[in-house]
Design a protein with these regions (language model features):
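SDR active-site strand-loop-helix element
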Residues: 7, 38, 82, 103-109, ...
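N-terminal Rossmann-fold cofactor-binding loop
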Residues: 38-43, 61-62
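A conserved pocket-lining segment of Rossmann-fold NAD(P)-dependent short-chain dehydrogenase/reductase
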Residues: 162-183, 191-195, 202-203, 208
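Mid/C-terminal beta-alpha module of Rossmann-like enzyme folds, strongest
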Residues: 198-258, 274, 280-308
């Protein structure tokens, strides 16, 4: 491995990956590897300025195959794609054309959902990239994180934090008694690095990357409340009522707004074992109560700033 392409480096997961790269630079002889990273013009790149590694910055997008071909131009042997499953087909197709033979794609455990809208599209993308790599005799490793948290714009736990902070009477579907296993982005950054640096172990495999232990959604809410220092009264609402409400919205908007499947997914358990990753590269993620501390501190600091 001498020349590596990386997408998604400016996201929270990517920044923790870069942290691991910098930390292990001498031990793993990273000075002999050339990295090319994808950035948008609007990206904050200050975190790259003091990085001692050989990193080439490419500003652009990979929204189409034509865009992706510009990014992968050159002689590269490995692609680590963190920038979203929806762009996997075009970036893999482009990289194959340029001779890349090793792929690490960050996809999602959403592939396991029994609901069509949530899972079917992901399954189709998985199948397509596998077909492309198989035809090109390229190795493909797929990483599937669960619900990711650790950023105030993660769209997951950050939403829960705001809700817990603002709602003293807190409605929850079916008592919120179903298991999740959210994963801290710092644990993902380390996992991405370990997979990248251990091709002899991780090539051509698939790994679910979940958090430390399964946790009930109601316990997630309670832990957030404890760390925020607030008390909530949780009111259980039957899922049937929520689903009926989604149907009413669907009808009243003349089928323009369809929340039916989203409501169904809200009561779908999403806890997955990471035993395979633990066995292969010592993946050992934090438990939720420890990992979420940093995000709650960031939330409190932002709130204080706004209140000044």
């Amino acid at each position: 491995m001498k020349r590596v392409l990386i997408t998604g480096i400016s996201g929270k997961n990517g920044r923790y990956l870069l942290e691991e790269m910098s930390k292990n630079r001498e031990r793993d002889d990273l000075d002999n590897i050339h990295f090319k990273v994808l950035l948008r013009e609007s990206s904050d790149t200050s975190f790259l300025d003091e990085c001692p590694l050989d990193i080439e910055r490419y500003y652009g997008s990979i929204d189409t195959k034509e865009d992706a071909l510009k990014f992968v131009d050159g002689e590269y042997d490995t692609l680590l794609h963190i920038a979203g499953i929806q762009r996997s087909v075009q970036i893999v197709s482009a990289a194959i054309e340029k001779g890349v033979k090793r792929f690490i794609l960050v996809h999602t455990t959403g592939i396991y959902s029994k609901y069509k809208e949530a899972g079917e599209g992901y399954r189709q993308i998985d199948a397509k990239v596998k077909e492309i790599c198989e035809e090109a005799k390229a190795t493909l490793t797929i990483l599937r994180p669960t619900m990711i948290y650790g950023s105030l714009n993660d769209g997951n736990i950050s939403v829960f934090i705001k809700m817990v902070d603002k709602l003293r009477l807190f409605p929850v579907i079916n008592g919120a008694k179903y298991e999740l296993q959210p994963v801290w982005c710092k644990d993902l950054g380390k996992a991405f690095y370990d997979v990248l640096m251990n091709p002899e172990i991780t090539d051509s495999k698939e790994y679910d990357l979940s958090g430390g232990k399964p946790i009930l959604l109601i316990d997630i809410f309670k832990e957030i409340g404890n760390q925020l220092g607030v008390k909530n009264t949780f009111i259980s609402v039957p899922s049937g009522i929520e689903y009926l409400g989604a149907w009413i919205v669907y009808i009243l908007t003349f089928k323009k707004k369809d929340y039916r499947e989203k409501v169904q997914r809200m009561v779908e358990p999403r806890a997955y074992s990471h035993e395979k990753a633990a066995n292969d590269f010592n993946y050992s993620p934090h438990e939720f109560k420890d990992g979420v501390k940093e995000e709650i501190i960031m939330y409190k600091q932002l709130k204080e700033t706004k209140n000044k």
